[in-house]
């Protein structure tokens, strides 16, 4: 089989039509799935010996949240090491990373698998994976044809990474660095709230402003602080963490500013505080609303003048520290109640960020669940950990008062429970493995009972016509995939569609 000029032109056009990289990547994957008639396709970015999904089609939504480390996925490692098209035989003993992750085919293993490494020059930047349920599904395509597809995908991904780096260099001071894959922190989520938060992080990271990060417990405020630091000019210097809620009043000042020998009972030597440790770097003060008013005053002085005094020392030390603070309280209300200094609040909240709770993040819960499933798989040495449809439905309708932290613990507990009731190293998480209280699932929609105005033949044809239409819509008008879904021969499906008036 040879790709026509029209097919290749259509792929190139789809890459130009998208608004933003994510949309272009999704258009590319959707188009390739139609052209190659595969059951699943994915575009992956390579970073730090792991593949990160950027766009998928035909795979469970939680795949977008998974991070595929090469050490745990020998097929992906083989793709990363190859310089060309990789075809895995149907009887390959290497496990497929997408086994159990094709909706409707959870119990079946992928049979046909092709991997296309993507390069920018000599640098591996990603991969394109094509999977099918039939062993010989991709035999009709030559390696040369697949190389053309890989070249188009590599160009799109390379341009996207280069644009991201150029945009980053425009915001950061200093000379431009040579091209390399853009580093990203593990901030998983595609919801509007998370997309906006990532944009704000990118903006404020390039500055040296203090940042106040607010959000409920368990939303990931520390992760936001880490993302800001890693994207800032201070990234080469330390990020120092201090939980203000865990500080006894008697040692809080010493923890922040240090002390000299003999300053108090037990001070047997000089000790640097967190501000000194973070010099030229970043200090993250978690739960800053827990600090006493006396310590708030001393912290304010550091922010104003940039100098500190160790406990028991009359000398001042100059420090250059960027402060990121986090709280789960409403500090405006704390100021009105007299429990937090207004001047410190204004110093800290030069650029406020708000982390949305998990219940407001829509499908992000499924992406995060996929991420934690993959973490559990690696930690416990399992071959696969997948979510059943019932488990996904449950997760999407639970309120998660404990936010992302509660989801993480729930996934870990469910994996342990499922593993205890199954033999082997494959784990499927069902709804009953989660102990969520008072989860109200929407009732299944009752099927409408039509008023019969047709004879049996007409009613049968109407049913067949609608069934085929729905199957085509679900498979992006891919007739081969539609036939597999309906469990019929593709030639018979074409003939039936013509008889029903669905094809010319």
From Swiss-Prot:
Keyword ATP-binding recorded: yes
UniProt keywords, alphabetically: ATP-binding, DNA-binding, Nucleotide-binding, Phosphoprotein, Transcription, Transcription regulation
DNA-binding region of this protein: 479-498
The Sigma-54 factor interaction domain, residue ranges: 187-416
Protein name listed in UniProt: Anaerobic nitric oxide reductase transcription regulator NorR
GO terms, molecular function: ATP binding; ATP hydrolysis activity; DNA binding; DNA-binding transcription factor activity
Organism of derivation: Escherichia coli O1:K1 / APEC
Residues binding ATP: 215-222, 278-287
Pathway it works in: Nitrogen metabolism; nitric oxide reduction
Modification type 4-aspartylphosphate: residues: 57
Described purpose of this protein according to its UniProt entry: Required for the expression of anaerobic nitric oxide (NO) reductase, acts as a transcriptional activator for at least the norVW operon. Activation also requires sigma-54.
Annotated GO biological process: phosphorelay signal transduction system
């Amino acid at each position: 089989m040879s790709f026509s000029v029209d097919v290749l032109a259509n792929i190139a056009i789809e890459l130009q039509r998208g608004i933003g990289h994510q949309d272009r990547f999704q258009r590319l994957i959707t188009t390739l799935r139609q052209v190659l008639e595969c059951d699943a396709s994915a575009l992956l970015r390579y970073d730090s010996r792991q593949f990160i999904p950027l766009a998928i089609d035909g795979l469970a939504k939680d795949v977008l949240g998974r991070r595929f480390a090469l050490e745990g996925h020998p097929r992906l490692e083989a793709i990363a090491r190859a310089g060309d098209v990789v075809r895995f035989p149907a009887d390959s003993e290497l496990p497929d990373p997408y086994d159990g992750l094709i909706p409707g085919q959870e119990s079946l293993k992928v049979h046909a698998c092709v991997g296309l490494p993507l390069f920018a020059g000599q640098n591996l930047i990603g991969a394109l994976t094509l999977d099918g349920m039939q062993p010989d599904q991709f035999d009709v395509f030559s390696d040369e044809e697949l190389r053309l597809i890989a070249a188009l995908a590599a160009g799109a991904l390379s341009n996207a990474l280069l644009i991201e780096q150029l945009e980053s260099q425009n915001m950061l001071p200093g000379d431009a660095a040579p091209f390399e894959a853009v580093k990203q922190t593990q901030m998983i989520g595609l919801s509007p709230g998370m997309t906006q938060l990532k944009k704000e992080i990118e903006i404020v990271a390039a500055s040296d402003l203090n940042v106040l990060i607010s959000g409920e417990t368990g939303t990931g405020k520390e992760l936001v602080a880490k993302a800001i630091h890693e994207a800032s000019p201070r990234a080469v210097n330390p990020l120092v963490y201090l939980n203000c809620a865990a500080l006894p009043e008697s040692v809080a000042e010493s923890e922040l500013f240090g002390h000299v020998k003999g300053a108090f009972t037990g001070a047997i030597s000089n000790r640097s505080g967190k501000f000194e440790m973070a010099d030229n770097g970043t200090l993250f003060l978690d739960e800053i609303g827990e600090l006493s008013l006396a310590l708030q005053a001393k912290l304010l002085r550091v922010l104003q003048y940039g100098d500190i005094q160790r406990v028991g020392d009359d000398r001042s030390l100059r420090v250059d520290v960027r402060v990121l603070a986090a709280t789960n309280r409403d500090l405006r209300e704390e100021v009105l109640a007299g429990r937090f200094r207004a001047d410190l609040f204004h110093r800290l909240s030069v650029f406020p960020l708000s982390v949305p709770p998990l219940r407001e993040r829509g499908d992000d819960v499924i992406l995060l669940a996929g991420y934690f499933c993959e973490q559990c798989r690696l930690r416990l040495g399992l071959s696969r950990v997948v979510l059943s449809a019932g488990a996904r439905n449950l997760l999407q309708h639970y309120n998660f008062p404990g936010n992302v932290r509660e989801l993480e613990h729930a996934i870990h507990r469910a994996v342990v429970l499922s593993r205890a009731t199954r033999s082997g190293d494959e784990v499927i998480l069902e709804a009953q493995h989660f102990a969520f209280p008072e989860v109200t699932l929407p009732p299944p929609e009752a099927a409408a009972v039509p008023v019969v105005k047709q004879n049996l033949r007409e009613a049968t044809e109407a049913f067949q016509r609608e069934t085929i239409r729905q199957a085509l819509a679900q498979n992006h008008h891919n007739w081969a995939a539609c036939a597999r879904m309906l469990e019929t021969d593709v030639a018979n499906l074409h003939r039936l569609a013509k008889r029903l008036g669905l094809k010319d």
